[in-house]
Amino acid sequence: MRAVVQRVARGSVTVEGSVRGEVERGLVVLLGVGRGDTDDDAGYLADKVANMRIFEDGQGKMNLSVLDVKGSVLAVSQFTLYGDCRKGRRPGFSGAAPPEEARRLFELFVKELEKYGLKVATGVFREHMTVEIINDGPVTLLLDSKKNF
């Protein structure tokens, strides 16, 4: 399971002209589910996202988590994080999990975040979405539950 985590001042996701999820100060998480990912991968990434200290404290040091700053999370499914661009000019997506399994694990990831007491907004699975991200910093991190990066 892979995630692009961005610290944001604001974020929203719109589907067919309607805002479906939005957050103020917090994180936008673009989440990709890969073939072979399990419940453990969802739990691992939820723990990382909830507890990563990427917000600045009073001294300007990244020392606070989204929990500490009482922020929220906008989680957006994104199978393209498993795009393989090593051959040719069009990415292949064979590394992405099948849609049914990806949906189940995405929803589990959201539930795991909510267990921490976080407010979590989401996009709409398997829909074309317009995602607005107002970065803060900018701070953008890559996470992989298999620890590939």
UniProtKB/Swiss-Prot annotation:
Protein name: D-aminoacyl-tRNA deacylase
MF-aspect GO terms: D-tyrosyl-tRNA(Tyr) deacylase activity; Gly-tRNA(Ala) deacylase activity; Ser(Gly)-tRNA(Ala) hydrolase activity; tRNA binding
Family of the protein in this entry: Belongs to the DTD family.
Keyword Lipid metabolism set for record: no
Subunit structure: Homodimer.
Recorded catalytic activity of this chain's protein: glycyl-tRNA(Ala) + H2O = tRNA(Ala) + glycine + H(+); a D-aminoacyl-tRNA + H2O = a tRNA + a D-alpha-amino acid + H(+)
Any coiled-coil regions, as ranges: none
Biological role stated in the UniProt entry: An aminoacyl-tRNA editing enzyme that deacylates mischarged D-aminoacyl-tRNAs. Also deacylates mischarged glycyl-tRNA(Ala), protecting cells against glycine mischarging by AlaRS. Acts via tRNA-based rather than protein-based catalysis; rejects L-amino acids rather than detecting D-amino acids in the active site. By recycling D-aminoacyl-tRNA to D-amino acids and free tRNA molecules, this enzyme counteracts the toxicity associated with the formation of D-aminoacyl-tRNA entities in vivo and helps enforce protein L-homochirality.
SUPFAM superfamilies: DTD-like
Domain of life of the organism encoding this protein: Bacteria
Chaperone keyword on record: no
Domain notes: A Gly-cisPro motif from one monomer fits into the active site of the other monomer to allow specific chiral rejection of L-amino acids.
GO cellular component: cytoplasm
GO biological process: one example: D-amino acid catabolic process
Organism this protein belongs to: Pelotomaculum thermopropionicum (strain DSM 13744 / JCM 10971 / SI)
